[in-house]
Amino acid sequence: MEKKKNIWVGKIVVIVLIIVSIGSYYVFPSVKHVMNQVFKMFASGDFAVVRDFVASYGAYAALISFLLMIFQSIAAPLPAFLITFANANLFGWWQGAILSWSSAMAGAAVCFFIARILGRDVAEKLTSKAGMQQIDTFFKKYGKNTVLICRLLPFISFDIVSYAAGLTSMSFISFFVATGVGQLPATIVYSYVGGMLTGGAKFLVTGLLILFALSALIFMGRKIYMDRQNKKAK
């Protein structure tokens, strides 16, 4: 009974926050202007645009970056690596890595609890039905390892994985630990690259993305092979 009550309270709080956020967008011109800037910034695909936007807030730049990372997590699949590059370029690679990692963890937690509290319908509206079904297949095949595997695949929105994990029986602690471990290597590499990134470094970024994809495919291939061997042994 107490658990059901807590779930309903959680639903009410989340729904109120969503209503207030949407209402603010339409009622306050300044909020609408900033939000339109944010969407345009992500749509540009240019980390320099993101960097300049964050830097424009001066002493509050780190806070704005933190909130941006949470926002892009909720509004999947906006590209998180743009923020990671911008953070490293603005604050230095290791300081940027800490900021990007911690804010991504916060964003993942928010997505997880949105799905757990509000359910599948809301999660699919914030992402896509096809995307959620794709991740469902991963969870059926690899279980809790899905969080680690998908973190290695740069072409899969990890935010969708966070939503999908919230719909499973996976505990938050297990999800949070797997998320922290899984995203750390990519965050460090992206931050290191972002710290020295210029407009002419697109080929380097592309090469890194391909490297991550190949690493993930090798990992998945090994996992599938081991699963088949275990089945044969049984």
Q: What feature does the model see in each segment?
A:
Residues V14-V20, L211-A216:
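Core hydrophobic alpha-helical transmembrane segments of single-pass membrane proteins
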Residues K11, A55, A59-S102, T137-L197:
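Hydrophobic alpha-helical membrane segments of integral membrane proteins
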Residues T179, G194-G195, F203-L211:
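Pore-lining and gate-forming transmembrane alpha-helices of multi-pass membrane transport proteins
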Residues E2-G10, S21-S65, M105-I160, L167-T168, ...:
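Membrane-interfacial helix-loop-helix
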Residues M69, A104, A108, Q183, ...:
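Residue-level recognition of pore/gate-forming positions within transmembrane alpha-helices
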